[in-house]
């Protein structure tokens, strides 16, 4: 792995992101959401990895998404692999209090097939990420089993996310924003944790 480019990308993609401005400007269209992508110590999984939570601002101790993300690089592509965590409830709030993650490596991870994100630099400091091809990333949504389409644009200041789910049998859109992408601003960065000693 080319360490320096990987570390620079890790700084960009990690942090606390909030769409507060978007939600305040359009409260009927957009909920106020925070995304936390917190770097873990390298020794946790012997690789570059992150603990992620997504939550509504009004319910910060009840995240609707928790995952481990492992970062790797293949030539010019950065791969953000997604994993489910065994007994994830034990680690709720770990994005806010890292001490809650001390024993996370003792619990099994389950890779989410088809759900890795592939990021490529489109111009200096700006990256476009798309979910791996094949429509094999599945999410249960109510009684529906859906496949996911996802696109993320990110730089050191902003993360723009477009996620949607489609019925497997009909390809009909089942979930996702009806009013365009979610626009998040980075409000906290974790650069101090990511340097040449992050290994």
UniProtKB/Swiss-Prot annotation:
Gene3D superfamilies: CpcT/CpeT domain (2.40.128.590). One of its GO terms (molecular function) is lyase activity. It comes from the Bacteria. Keywords: Lyase. Its EC number is 4.-.-.-. Belongs to the CpcT/CpeT biliprotein lyase family. Covalently attaches a chromophore to Cys residue(s) of phycobiliproteins. This is Chromophore lyase CpcT/CpeT. It comes from Prochlorococcus marinus (strain NATL1A).
């Amino acid at each position: 792995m080319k360490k320096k480019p990987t570390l620079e990308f890790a700084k960009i993609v990690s942090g606390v992101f909030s769409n507060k401005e978007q939600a305040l400007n359009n409260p009927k269209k957009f909920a106020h959401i925070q995304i936390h992508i917190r770097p873990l110590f390298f020794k946790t999984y012997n690789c570059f990895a992150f603990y992620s939570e997504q939550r509504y601002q009004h319910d910060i101790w009840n995240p609707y998404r928790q995952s481990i993300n492992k970062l790797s690089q293949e030539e010019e592509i950065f791969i953000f692999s997604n994993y489910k965590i065994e007994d994830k409830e034990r680690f709720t709030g770990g994005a806010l209090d890292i001490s809650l993650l001390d024993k996370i490596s003792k619990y099994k991870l389950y890779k989410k097939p088809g759900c890795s994100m592939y990021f490529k630099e489109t111009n200096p400091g700006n990256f476009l990420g798309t979910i791996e091809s094949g429509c094999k990333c599945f999410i249960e949504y109510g009684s529906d089993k859906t496949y996911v389409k996802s696109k993320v644009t990110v730089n050191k200041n902003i993360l723009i996310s477009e996620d949607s789910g489609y019925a497997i049998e009909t390809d009909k859109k089942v979930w996702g924003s009806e009013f365009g992408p979610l626009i998040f601003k980075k409000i906290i960065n974790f650069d101090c944790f990511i340097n040449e000693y992050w290994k």
